[in-house]
């Protein structure tokens, strides 16, 4: 019997580049339980067409948490050039953070929303990519008061 796969639903948005930045993004990507590389390099699994990105900008790394039978993921920053924001937390070169069920990630103008749906397979996971026509991350603007 085949075990259901863990699914990452990944939505992508860029305010100025739009679909051009995501021209090489597949609709679906099935991947083994090794790290998934994101960047502008030809050897990345998720290749994004932005000159300010590093060839290897970040990775999504699956792992098995102690006491769990489901894949968990962490995001690791692979670039020295810039900061990657994950759920409001700034990360720099080689820093990593575990991902929850819903994750808001931004880097180099790209907004990425990653939703994890658990599955029983520990050998493989699948990503479904969606291009968003509108922003995925909203930051409230500071309001001035008379106080």
UniProtKB/Swiss-Prot annotation:
Biological process according to GO: auditory behavior; cellular response to cAMP; cellular response to Thyroid stimulating hormone; cochlea morphogenesis; craniofacial suture morphogenesis; genitalia morphogenesis; hard palate morphogenesis; hematopoietic progenitor cell differentiation
Lineage: superkingdom: Eukaryota
Role noted for this protein: Inhibits TIFA-mediated TRAF6 activation possibly by inducing a conformational change in TIFA.
Gene that encodes it: Tifab
Subunit structure: Interacts with TIFA.
Tissue expression notes: Expressed at high levels in spleen and at moderate levels in lung, thymus, and small intestine.
Domain FHA as annotated: residue spans: 36-108
A GO-annotated cellular component: cytosolic large ribosomal subunit
Name of the protein: TRAF-interacting protein with FHA domain-containing protein B
A Pfam family recorded for this sequence: FHA
Lineage summary: Eukaryota, Metazoa, Chordata, Craniata, Vertebrata
UniProt GO MF annotations: deubiquitinase activator activity; ribonucleoprotein complex binding
Entry-linked InterPro entries: FHA_dom (IPR000253), SMAD_FHA_dom_sf (IPR008984), TIFA (IPR033621)
